[in-house]
């Protein structure tokens, strides 16, 4: 990052890099959770659920790329090893040991709800300190809110289908 850009962030730059790295850990784990969940999914509306999980996986990977770029712009070092993801994660990882679509949806809804909280904290922390990270965090949080809504809509559709049988 340029010296003027870094100086705008000031003394909080190391804390922001730490928060971004924790979010990066979450995004990588979310990417894999969505991707592998799409591969093993079973049950009613599997096709629709798989499409949604694959789409979300792609978007989580995009978030990871945004976070890495911002960490580098701030002069930080992004997490370099997968084992660091488990040490730094805010939201953890839920292996899709039960591939039933309703279980997968619930696991991923919980992940999205955690992600929304993570990005809300980033938005709050960077609002008056780092406008670039603030805008990026707001954009990612908006995506995470949409993901939660998408998954809950699928959950509701499955429930409605069961009730109408």
Show the residue positions of the predicted features.
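Iron-associated oxidoreductase/ferritin-like identity signal
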Residues: 1-165
């Amino acid at each position: 990052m340029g010296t003027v850009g870094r100086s705008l962030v000031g003394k909080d730059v190391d804390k922001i890099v730490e928060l971004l790295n924790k979010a990066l850990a979450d995004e990588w784990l979310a990417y894999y959770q969505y991707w592998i969940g799409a591969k093993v999914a079973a049950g009613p509306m599997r096709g629709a659920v798989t499409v949604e999980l694959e789409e979300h996986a792609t978007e989580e990977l995009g978030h990871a790329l945004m976070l890495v770029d911002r960490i580098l712009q701030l002069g930080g070092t992004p997490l370099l090893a997968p084992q660091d993801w488990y040490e730094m994660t805010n939201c953890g990882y839920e292996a899709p040991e039960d591939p039933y679509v309703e279980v997968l949806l619930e696991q991923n809804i919980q992940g999205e709800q955690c992600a929304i909280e993570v990005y809300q904290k980033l938005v709050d922390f960077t609002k008056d300190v780092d406008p670039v990270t603030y805008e990026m965090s707001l954009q990612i949080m908006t995506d995470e809110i949409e993901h939660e809504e998408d998954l809950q809509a699928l959950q509701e559709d499955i429930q409605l289908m069961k009730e109408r049988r």
